[in-house]
């Protein structure tokens, strides 16, 4: 009996020890697990920029514990640093430095699932005081975000260098109000590029951006643009381009559908090839337009330029030809399959449409420069 009790007691003791050990292991595992779950603290060390800390805290810290768990980090697909947010944040500051207007990108590289980046660091004003210090620091940290498809940057004051080829999946790029663009490299997957008031002394080479479909620029200046033989580029729109761009050469673009150039007084020459539509307005530096080899051309709108000569003898496919308010005195319409012709405001005397059998609309008014009382007689020859 005593032996039996001893055995039972021993077994009971073993069970207690095992249970105790498991409990201890569970406690240690729980502590370890909690330690592993501890996220990235939202502090100056991890996010040096005061504004970035505020943004991360308000937008991404869902449980307001001043740290980011991996789930919170993975949930971020867009980084948006916006001027409206800047104004809101500025109102709560009492210091006089306003360093938030200089955005330090350090820390943002942890958001690996980001697909869209929008950063605006434009000049802002607070209490009637213009804040002159603004710009981006450590932009290269964002290259670690390899899922980015769309990038928008506005207001960079510092000497800007963007190696956009380091974003392997980048498809859309927009740069605004960048006064000192020092270097710009594009990736092969980019489909759309837009510049608004961007200035650089460099030549912009788009010839190797093989996926590019659209290029748009307003108030843009550089030392020339190289388009090359980009087969997917279909639309080019440029307005108010600067004095560094003297020539636009799109003659090697085989699939270009539309070229639009407006308000560009410094532009001297345009070379075009396989194109369907061309639209020039207020480009007074251009003196001649050669569309003689543009056998795909359907629509030409050229208004208020310095053009006095148009070469088009081998372009029978044009349906609409508008050459209003230029300096054209003569035009050869031989073999032209034109339905609508406008020559308003040109110092032209004779218009021979005898070989342009399809013309059904002709718009001709007297030249803007005709003196009062001078009757300008325009003769239209149909046969």
Predicted features by range, described:
Residues 5-25:
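Sec-dependent N-terminal signal peptides of Gram-positive bacterial secreted proteins and lipoproteins
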Residues 1-3:
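N-terminal secretory signal peptides that target proteins for export/translocation
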Residues 22-157, 161-199, 203-210, 219-231, ...:
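N-terminal capping/linker segments that flank leucine-rich repeat
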